[in-house]
Amino acid sequence: MSEKDRIDLHGRSQGDFHIPVELIHSWKDLNEPFGIKDSYSRFIYANPAYLELLNLPKDFDIVGRLDSELPTPIAEFAEQFQYHERKVEMERQRISSLEIHRFSGNEFRAYFFDRYPYINQDGHIIGTIFHGRVAEFIPLSCYVQSGFNDPQPILFKKPSDIFTDAEWSVVFFALQNFSQKEIATSLGLKQKTINNRLDSIYKKARVSGLCQLINYIMENKLANYIPERLLRSGHYIMNIGQNKK
């Protein structure tokens, strides 16, 4: 492939870094985020969809910048991203993460991000490729320890008014097999308050205990709701579907 068929970004990052123009053409019009970083986690390329996800202008010059240098809420997770990228380079395998952030607004959004080693013509790893996609479905086992592993769509908005907001928070922890004491500690409440809320929840669901409540939640497809008050922005490395050496 001749030099005219490549995009040369030498000088914007450590060493020579060439991106085949075919990759740029393949990614630029896609509605899913794609990009490349060098081995120092500096951006070499990011497609318009990634800039849009971060609410950055289309002409924003991202090349040569670190995540920590971007004017976005995810900047505070730069060190975690770098750890992820070094792990990809070391293991020479795809490693995925679940990203839950207020990417560009007030509402939480969830994305899966896959990171792959970027290998040059000499077989050396010189960075990472990333690809993001909306996390419409995740295995409940990622956050619910109930034994139900069927993928369900994530919901950040209350799926039903059968329970109050306070009761939904209790349901969330109950699905993870938290004891009443553990739920009370997590929510900063007295155990008696949790007991009263569970009684109210059981009554509304017309069940007599936790096992029946779990079945009720699963049968009505309510287990995919994560109360926003319990959410924190985060970068969670996953092992679902990854290759193992």
Model-derived regions: residue spans:
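Recognition helix of helix-turn-helix DNA-binding domains
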Residues: 177-212
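Short helix-to-turn junction characteristic of helix-turn-helix DNA-binding domains
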Residues: 174-178, 217
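A cross-family signal for key residues in well-ordered alpha-helices
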Residues: 172, 185, 215
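Hydrophobic residues on short alpha-helical segments
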Residues: 171-172, 202
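Basic, Lys/Arg-enriched C-terminal extension of HTH/homeodomain DNA-binding domains
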Residues: 202-245
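Sensory/regulatory domains in signal-transduction proteins
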Residues: 32, 37-143
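PAS-family sensory modules
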Residues: 1-32, 126-169, 228-232, 242-245
